[in-house]
Amino acid sequence: MSGSIRRSYTAMQNFPRFLLGVLFVATLSSCRPRLSEDEANWKGQTETSEVEEHLLLDPGNALRLFCDTNQSSSINWYREQERLLSGGKIRMVGTVLEVSDVTYEDSGLYICVVRGTGKILRRFSISVVDSLASGDEEEEEEDDDDEDGRREDTTADINEEPVYFFQAPYWTQPSRMDKKLHAVPAGNTVKFRCPAGGSPLPTIRWSLKNGREFRGEHRIGGIQIRHQHWSLVMESVVPSDRGNYTCVVENRVGSLTYTYFLDVLERSSHRPILQAGLPANTTARVGSDVEFYCKVYSDAQPHIQWLKHIEVNGSHFGPDDFPYVQVLKTADINPSDVEVLHLRNITMEDAGEYTCLAGNSIGLSHQSAWLTVLPNEDFLEQAEPAESRYMDIIIYTSGFLAVAMAIMIVILCRMQTPHSKQTLQTPTVHKLAKFPLIRQFSLESSSSGKSSAPLIRITRLSSSCAPMLPGVMEVELPLDAKWEFPRDRLVLGKPLGEGCFGQVVRAEGYGIEKDRPEKPVTVAVKMLKDNGTDKDLSDLISEMELMKVIGKHKNIINLLGVCTQEGPLFVIVEYASKGNLREFLRARRPPTPEDAFDITKVPEELLSFKDLVSCAYQVARGMEYLESKRCIHRDLAARNVLVAEDNVMKIADFGLARGVHDIDYYKKTSNGRLPVKWMAPEALFDRVYTHQSDIWSFGVLTWEIFTLGGSPYPVIPYEELFKLLREGHRMDKPSNCTHELYMLMRECWHAVPTQRPTFKQLEHLDRILTAVSEEYLDLSMPFEQYSPSCEDSASTCSSSDDSVFAPDPVPSSPCVFNYHNIHSQLGT
């Protein structure tokens, strides 16, 4: 009895475990898809003639499929031979399958099968068009049209030709693939397409001529593979992109291949070409409408302006021999809009010369036409009575004014006579305003740069203390023994140039080299003229002190000494015998074909690609040194880089430079004129200068080097330049510049300052320098197209804009020096 009770008790204890095991097995059975009986049955029917129904959906849409059946038995749903279960975004109610928020992965073959028998009731081929990436939003309109056509064609094919469960890939639009050879200019965007179909939906990949898969890292600039468009897109193609491109379309049944050949054509290195005879001379009457036409042909992006020649102060030309003009119409994004100039309801004032001016990164072209305006006869009849009526009034008024002016002249002459005599008896005095100039540099220096005492002691120097050169302002400065050079050991020679308020004189210095005191060394001496202001004097002294603090480097103009005692202020610097870099490059351009046999126009030396890379590398080294000294240059350009013997580059013109110690940026608050074509956007719009803004200027300088002294942004007015820079436009690649170097320029012109390289990184140009030979690039082609159609201003003032037409005479801006002798120019 007790044993029976014990067995019953044990059974009761094990019953919950038994029940839990049964439930667990049942749960697993219900969760696991039934792939045995019905799946085996319908898999045997995959080659039947049941017709698929095709549906094309956009991502995010809902898929709803009905399995029509009169049978009472339940059904199962499969996608690509995998059974579907309710859950997540899949919902099955009776014979209806619902899939919410479909994606590209939901594409494939859907079938409904009678549970137990495996009989296939319906087949659905679902294609979900993958969403466009953000970079695809700029798809051309014709591509969109092509895609619409593809969808329509696909639909037509589906209606006319049934597609079965398994089908090898096939071309859906073979007529669009007839063009196997694609020849495009460099810089264009290329698109290859291989639209295909098949069941299941095939995949596409692209391979190069060696058979390996083509990926984005295989090409500078990357690629875009658009699976939903069956396309390969490459932007800004270069000659190295030439070759075969093969698309491979495949699914589980088979595969297809198709090969395209890409040929990239070099762009034409030529300034814009204007159609002969346009614009044409026109004659019209007052009140009529006139149109001038100008047809422009240019491979590079042209910039077009319509100009009207005007008269200013009785002259049509300014002091620089440039005509005075008024800009009537400007366009650069859509040149066709500006190829026609419309003049409505013209008057007599509209008569004159009109010019169509077109420019690109290579150079400028222009053609002019005259408009003759004839008066209307009615207008003449009405004007004659008015003229006779007012003639008497004009005569009497003119006579009265002439007498009054004569009396005024006599009175003024009598008043000026005593004053003039008194002035002749008074000795001339050069006056200096009483202002203390405190040093602004806190860098470590053994010179007097640590002193905070005023640098200028106000004195009056009469004309009896005659300076060494006439018209030179004198000032007394404290003695700095480290830099002071004896004035009597300096023999001044001929002037090298003069600028806004100063001049530079070539000189021989005895004792510049300490170990050879009797050997003369050729130097350049800077000094003020008598029309220099207190601000000019302050700038020159500040520059002198900055050069003391910066120290010496091979690739900058170095300070050799100063003369501050017993005479005018002299700043002695190194002499660069080959002038500034811009004129150095222009003088060494290969001759044009028409000048090839003119010995006088053949340059003394030609530059190789290696020489040009060396120029950029040396400037980068000099700027890296200035950056290490916390100096922001602010006016880095080819005109401010000098060339010494052995083609050594020396950065000059510290007139705009600023030394900074506690912060690495400088914000300008004055409204002086600035070198806008070399300035970074943050410097243009926010007046904030950093080492990164100098990097932007270095990119423009590199562009100048590889165009052999070309003018950046030709013809573009400042207002238009601001807009283009904001929109992300940049200058084209020079024709004799490699893609690698152009990509370096583009990195220097990055809109985000922190994304630009540093000068330390730019010093890696030496890698390119050692990798190329002297004959790497042939520079024997004519470079005259890089010059503007007139000579650029030789001024080193920051206001130089390299325009071919001056809209108005502009006074020189206050810069340190502005040399007219540009061949032997020495900048500060």
Curated annotation (Swiss-Prot):
What range(s) does the Ig-like C2-type domain occupy? Answer: 33-127, 169-259, 272-372
Cell compartment(s), UniProt: Cell membrane; Endosome; Endoplasmic reticulum
Report membrane topology: Single-pass type I membrane protein
Q: Which residues are glycosylated?
A: N70, N244, N281, N313, N345
| Broad class of the protein's primary localization | membrane
Q: Which domain of life is it from?
A: Eukaryota
Protein name in the entry: Fibroblast growth factor receptor 4
InterPro entries listed in its UniProt record:
FGF_rcpt_fam, Ig-like_dom, Ig-like_dom_sf, Ig-like_fold, Ig_I-set, Ig_sub, Ig_sub2, Kinase-like_dom_sf
Gene for this protein?
Answer: fgfr4
**PANTHER family in the record, alphabetically?**
FIBROBLAST GROWTH FACTOR RECEPTOR 4, TYROSINE-PROTEIN KINASE RECEPTOR
Check the record and name the SMART domains matching this protein: IG, IGc2, TyrKc
- Annotated region Disordered: the residues are 132-156
Where is the sequence biased in composition, kind Acidic residues?
135-147
**Entry keywords, A to Z:** ATP-binding, Cell membrane, Disulfide bond, Endoplasmic reticulum, Endosome, Glycoprotein, Immunoglobulin domain, Kinase, Membrane, Nucleotide-binding, Phosphoprotein, Receptor, Repeat, Signal, Transferase, Transmembrane, Transmembrane helix, Tyrosine-protein kinase, Ubl conjugation
Extracellular side residue ranges read 32-392
Q: Where does ATP bind?
A: L496, G497, E498, G499, C500, F501, G502, Q503, V504, K526
Please give the family membership noted in the entry.
Belongs to the protein kinase superfamily. Tyr protein kinase family. Fibroblast growth factor receptor subfamily.
Q: Which reaction does it catalyse?
A: L-tyrosyl-[protein] + ATP = O-phospho-L-tyrosyl-[protein] + ADP + H(+)
